[in-house]
Amino acid sequence: MRNPSNYAKSVNRPMWPLLPARAARILDVGGGHGTNAAAVRSKCGSRIAGVVDIAPDAIEHHDRSLDFAICDDIEQPGVIEAIHTTHGPFDLVLCLDVLEHLADPWRVIARLHSIMPDGGTAIASIPNIQNYRAVYRVLTGTWNYRASGLFDRTHLRYFARSSAVELMECSGLRVDAVCRALGHHRLARIADRLSLGLLGPFTTLQYQIRARRFSGDVRDPGSFGSNVSS
C-alpha cells in the first residue's frame, strides 16, 4: 500500500490503538525513514528504536532520533538475526505495509518471532484484497496496477482477513486483536455504518493486526505460504 512520495515519512495512526503501554525496544521493519518507530518510541517510552529498510534513500534520510537505521533486505538469511544480535531482543516489532511486498512473508514472520521475547508484540498493517474495489476490478476485468495503493505493482502477495491472520500466526504467534481501516472513501464508510459492519470484508481497505509471543518454541512455517495467497 506504499505511496512512494510520502509513505516513508508518514505515521500509521490506525494501528495506535493496538500499541502496548510500554515497549523497551522497537524494530520497524520496512519502515522507510523510521517515522513510525520514532512516533511509537515517544508514545511507548522506548529505550531503543530503529528501522530496517531496503531503500537506500529512505535510510539515508532516516529520523535522527532513532538509535539505528539499517539498509538491508530482510528476506536474506542472517539479516534479521544480525540485527537481533546487535540491538535486540525486540518487544515490539512493526510490519506496516511491508509484508505484501515480500516473496516469503511467512519465513520473515518466523524470523521476527525468534527475536522477540515472551510477551513481545508484533503489529502489522496488511491491505485487504477482498475490498470492494478489488472485487469490482476482478469482475470487470479491469485490474490495472498502479504506483501505490491497493493495486501497487510491487505487491507480491495478497491477503483477506483470514489469510492475514494465518500469516501472523504461522510460526506460533497468537493474534489477539484485529482492527479495520476503511480509508477515506465516504461511500464505503456510509455503507459500513448502515450495514452494521456486515459489509466489513468489502469496505475494509486494510487490516491492523496485533500478535503476541507466548512461551514456547518458534514453529517453522515450512511451505505454509506456498498454497496461501489470498
Please state what every model-predicted region is.
Residues 135-143:
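Short, flexible, mixed-charge acidic loops at enzyme active sites
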Residues 120-126:
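Conserved beta-strand signature within the Rossmann-like core of class I S-adenosyl-L-methionine
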Residues 103-107, 134:
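Short N-terminal helix/helix-N-cap motif within the alpha/beta-hydrolase-1
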Residues 146-163:
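Acceptor-substrate binding/catalytic loop of class I
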Residues 97, 127-129, 180-181:
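Histidine-centered beta-alpha loop that forms part of the nucleotide-sugar donor binding/catalytic region
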Residues 1-88, 92, 106-109, 124, ...:
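Conserved N-terminal segment of class I S-adenosyl-L-methionine
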Residues 107-118:
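A short glycine-rich, Lys/Arg-flanked "PGG" loop and its adjoining helix->strand segment in the class I
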Residues 92-98:
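A short beta-strand submotif of the Rossmann-like class I SAM-dependent methyltransferase core
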